[in-house]
From Swiss-Prot:
Key word Signal present: yes
Species the sequence originates in: Yersinia enterocolitica
UniProt KW keywords: Bacterial flagellum biogenesis, Periplasm, Signal
Protein name, per record: Flagella basal body P-ring formation protein FlgA
Entry similarity comment: Belongs to the FlgA family.
InterPro entries, sorted: Flag_basal_body_FlgA_C, Flagellar_FlgA, FlgA_N, SAF
Signal peptide positions on this chain: 1-26
Amino acid sequence: MNRNGVITCALGGLLLSQAATHQAMAADLSVQVNQFFQQQYPDKESQVKVVIKTPQNQWPQCDMPEITLPANARPWGNISLSVRCDGVRRFIQTQVQVSGHYAVAARQLAAGEKMTLQDIKMKQGRLDTLPPGALLEPNFAQGAVSLRQINAGQPLTRNMLRRLWIIKAGQDVQVLALGEGFNVNSNGKAMNNAAIQDNVRVRMASGQIVSGTVADDGTVHILL
């Protein structure tokens, strides 16, 4: 083989090596981005799929990229993800598809109706296609009043509902401390407004401040 042939083979081998390295780093980045979003949803019932929309030849290349979500970024949908490699920050465009549970109306509700737990049903489906403010658990809706007509099966959102304070700041409340095989009743004064299933802080007669959950009957439950 002449000298030119040797140089051509060497250059070809170098280009193949660089291409293989780039593909390996790209594959690693894809895996790391998917793992990053999986960690945002520790619930085992949530399923996450990430599609990187930025062309692969524009992906940052390094062994240990620092991946972060921009401030106030949505948890799913189209997200511009910050990736820092060797001190240089770049943004890659991703589409995050998340499937999990969300709350829907179990029946048709008229405007002004107070919702009970029986009016709420949990459904499995794509979360990233839901309207803004969709409820992923029933607590917010329980005891709230519908601001407009809600159809059966319609996803519940925060702007559809007005929560009713069952406890108001300064109100005397009954506190029920629940332990294994026993419970203790006492009284205190609420330090904040709270609806059913909300967390409320209570100042006890001794001056001690405790936190508990508001039950349907307005008592504050503390698990010991």
